[in-house]
From Swiss-Prot:
Main subcellular localisation: cytoplasm
PANTHER family: ASPARTATE--AMMONIA LIGASE (PTHR30073:SF5)
Keywords assigned: Amino-acid biosynthesis, Asparagine biosynthesis, ATP-binding, Cytoplasm, Ligase, Nucleotide-binding
Catalyzed reactions per annotation: L-aspartate + NH4(+) + ATP = L-asparagine + AMP + diphosphate + H(+)
Native source organism of the sequence: Ureaplasma parvum serovar 3 (strain ATCC 700970)
Keyword Cytoplasm: yes
Name assigned to this protein: Aspartate--ammonia ligase
Length: 329
């Protein structure tokens, strides 16, 4: 590695620290959040791990002294809602934390890695807040935070090509299908994001009029009528990148309806988390995750997520990227 390449990597590392520190400061202030510590692993039988699309298997290990099988978290969606209850948060107060996960079955490409790092967050809300207007108000706060950090990073490192609009554009998954009926869901996201630069697609989970789903969602935490994805257009890669997924959490009625629809009723009696929902023991919350490496990749105008995070990649893959001038950490 030559000196120029080393200097470039060192500058990137410093910029990553700037982005993370700045984002956390503004994020906590704008959403009234307190930072908390979070688990790296949970008991496999607790029901607290996120099973994502129920096809990706969590990485697990046997803890000899505990005589238990533990699972590396795939996200903290369920744990956070329980934490708000246990930690005694008040209405409209929330938490955020660093979530580090291993998703062994994930794809590997310029925006996907088997290592996932994100800010997981959750806020205590009222039942009356379970509506699209409230969801959009939270999205606007998160987007304004991203934009503040973008402007700060532009002044420090001048990536130039990153341009975010003053406001984010909202569209439902059905409206998006109506707009581009002959395109795949991912292609619709790309076309709309390329035009508007920053978008939020809401109401993801149920089939659209075509019979297809925008993208598969677990039925256990988000209300599929009150959730969505925050997506930006990354000009360097000519690509739509999801920076955040979030939603108002399920009530008992939402949970029953969605698990019945997804045919995932078989383990409810033995699942601690499911039982808490069914017995109305969990507070009403809104929450989500914001990809740390993806945000850094986007704001620093990088071609590959491996330029801003350390993971494991196939040797041939790394060699091919190196030929293109892309050095993975």
């Amino acid at each position: 590695m030559d000196q120029l390449q080393k200097a470039k990597i060192n500058q990137t590392q410093k910029a990553i620290v700037e982005i993370k520190n700045s984002f956390q400061k503004h994020f906590a202030k704008n959403l009234n959040l307190s930072r908390v510590t979070a688990p790296l692993f949970v008991e496999g039988q607790s029901g607290l791990n996120d099973h994502l699309d129920h096809k990706q298997k969590a990485v697990s290990f046997y803890a000899k002294k505990l005589d238990k099988t533990l699972e590396i978290v795939q996200s903290l969606a369920k744990w956070k809602r329980l934490a708000l209850l246990d930690y005694g948060f008040s209405l409209y107060e929330g938490l955020y934390t660093d979530m580090n996960a291993i998703r062994a079955d994930d794809d590997i490409d310029e925006i996907h890695s088997i290592y996932v790092d994100q800010w997981d967050w959750e806020i205590l809300i009222n039942n009356q807040d379970c509506n699209l207007d409230f969801l959009k108000s939270i999205v606007n706060k998160i987007y304004s935070t991203i934009r503040i950090v973008q402007l700060e990073i532009d002044q420090l490192y001048n990536p130039k090509q990153i341009i975010l609009p003053d406001s984010i554009t909202f569209i439902s998954s059905q409206e998006l299908e109506d707009l581009y009926p002959h395109l795949s869901p991912s292609r619709r996201e790309y076309e709309f994001a390329k035009i508007h630069k920053a978008i939020f697609i809401y109401q993801i989970g149920y089939p659209l009029k075509s019979g297809y789903i925008q993208s598969i969602r677990s039925p256990e935490y988000d209300n599929w009528n009150l959730n969505g994805d925050l997506i930006v257009y990354h000009k360097l890669n000519d690509q739509a990148i999801e920076l955040s997924s979030m939603g108002i959490r399920v009530s008992k009625q939402d949970f029953i309806k969605q698990t019945n629809f997804a045919n995932l009723k078989n383990d409810q009696e033995n699942n601690f988390y499911h039982q808490m929902i069914l017995n109305n023991q969990l507070p009403q919350t809104i929450g989500g995750g914001i990809g740390q490496s993806r945000l850094c990749m986007f704001l620093l105008n990088k071609k590959h997520i491996g330029e801003v995070q350390v993971s494991v990649w196939p040797n041939e893959y790394k060699d091919e990227l190196l030929k293109k001038g892309i050095k993975l950490l």
